[in-house]
Amino acid sequence: MALTKEDILNAIAEMPVMDLVELIEAAEEKFGVTATAAVAAAAPAAGGEAAAEQTEFDVVLTSFGGNKVAVIKAVRGATGLGLKEAKEVVEAAPKAIKEGVAKEEAEELKKTLEEAGAEVELK
């Protein structure tokens, strides 16, 4: 007999928290996805009006990851800072790289920094 969605949800509801964490990690590995991406995608739906009203964003570097040199180069290119200043900004993470920028520019900068290996948040 095949399991229904209801059966699966009931089984998950009865699982201890640590088992749920392991289940999520196994699902992420098996399907090549991350739960944080799903949560981030669902968040605007929950607060749709508030998210739609925001027009200016702060691009915040939360971590430079494993490739500090590439992140410094990306910060220099995006901000026009000198090498020393860009290095100081990157090493001071978490730190705002740009503040009060349009959504499109903020997303483009986030993409550039993430491609360089950084972890970035838009606020």
From Swiss-Prot:
SUPFAM superfamilies per record: ClpS-like (SSF54736), Ribosomal protein L7/12, oligomerisation (N-terminal) domain (SSF48300)
GO BP: translation
InterPro entries in UniProt: Ribosomal_bL12, Ribosomal_bL12_C, Ribosomal_bL12_C/ClpS-like, Ribosomal_bL12_oligo, Ribosomal_bL12_oligo_N_sf
Single GO MF descriptor: mRNA binding
CDD domains in the record: Ribosomal_L7_L12 (cd00387)
Assigned keywords, A-Z: Ribonucleoprotein, Ribosomal protein
One Pfam family linked to the record: Ribosomal_L12
Span of the signal peptide: none
Listed GO CC annotations: cytosolic large ribosomal subunit
Assembly description: Homodimer. Part of the ribosomal stalk of the 50S ribosomal subunit. Forms a multimeric L10(L12)X complex, where L10 forms an elongated spine to which 2 to 4 L12 dimers bind in a sequential fashion. Binds GTP-bound translation factors.
Family per record: Belongs to the bacterial ribosomal protein bL12 family.
HAMAP family in alphabetical order: Ribosomal_bL12
Role summary: Forms part of the ribosomal stalk which helps the ribosome interact with GTP-bound translation factors. Is thus essential for accurate translation.
Name recorded for this polypeptide: Large ribosomal subunit protein bL12
Native source organism of the sequence: Pseudoalteromonas atlantica (strain T6c / ATCC BAA-1087)
Originating gene: rplL
